[in-house]
Amino acid sequence: MPSYYVNKNIQPTGEHEVHKEGCHRMPELQNRVYLGYFSNAIDAVREARRYYTNVD
């Protein structure tokens, strides 16, 4: 299962983006929150909503 992260910075469209380990758009280490291992992005987004309300 891959690791997922959420960007601490808000995107111009207003949400915090979730990224899978290895993503070419992965935020810098200081700009991301580790979410954990998930078998799919939907579960990772659910976890990210514990930190931020507007997540994609």
Q: Which residues make up each language-model segment?
A:
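Aromatic side chains
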Residues: Y4-Y5, H19, F38, Y52
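Short aromatic-glycine-(Arg/Gly/Cys) micro-motifs in beta-strand/loop hairpins
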Residues: Y5-R32
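A short, exposed loop/beta-hairpin motif centered on an aromatic-Gly-Thr core
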Residues: E28-N40, D56
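Short, compact, well-ordered microdomains
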Residues: V45-D56
